[in-house]
Amino acid sequence: AARRVRDVQDRLEAIVRAYVLPAFTSGSDLAGGGTRFTRLRAIMSAEGNEVVRKIIAQTFDDTSHAFIDAIHDSLPHIPRTDLVWRGHFLLGALYYTLVTPERVSRLSRGSAEGTDAGHAIEELVRATVAALQAPPLDPAISAPRRAPGFTPGRALT
C-alpha cells in the first residue's frame, strides 16, 4: 500500500507512522491497550529472558521484516543492514518514550508534556524519517573511533 504514495518523504512518514501508531493507541483501554502492552514488551525485552526473547521474535519479527523491507523499497540506495540498525534505534526510542514520558516533561521544564501521544508520535516519525534518510555509512569511515589512550576492555576511571 505504501508504494502508492509517490513522494518518498510522504511514503516514509506513512510507513513509520503505521509502525509506531499501534504502540500509542488504546492506552485508556482497560484490557491493556497498545501503550500498556508496548511498555510491558519494552521492560520484558530489557530483562534478557531467553524465553521472552523467543516469544517476542516469533510474534514480531515478521512485522519488523515487513517494515524494514518497505523502508528498503523506498530507500534502495541504503544497505538493508543500515536500515535494520536504524529500525532497532526506532524501537529503543519508542520504548523509552512510552516507559519514561515524564522525562520529556522534566527536561523541557514543563514546556512539553511527555504524555502527549500525538506530539510524541509526530516527533518520533520526523526523527526516524530523518535518520532513515541519512547517507549510508562509509565502511572506511565507520570503523570504531577510539579516544586517545583508550584500551578496549579496560574500565574508565
Report each predicted region and the residues it spans:
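Hydrophobic alpha-helical connector segments
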Residues: 1-37
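Short amphipathic alpha-helical interaction patches enriched in hydrophobic/aromatic residues
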Residues: 2-3, 49-52, 75
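Non-catalytic, well-ordered alpha-helical scaffold segments
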Residues: 13, 17, 35-39, 84-91, ...
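Short alpha-helical scaffolding segments that buttress acidic/His motifs in well-ordered protein cores
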Residues: 19, 23, 38-45, 90, ...
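Amphipathic alpha-helical segments used for helix-helix packing
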Residues: 30-61, 101-106
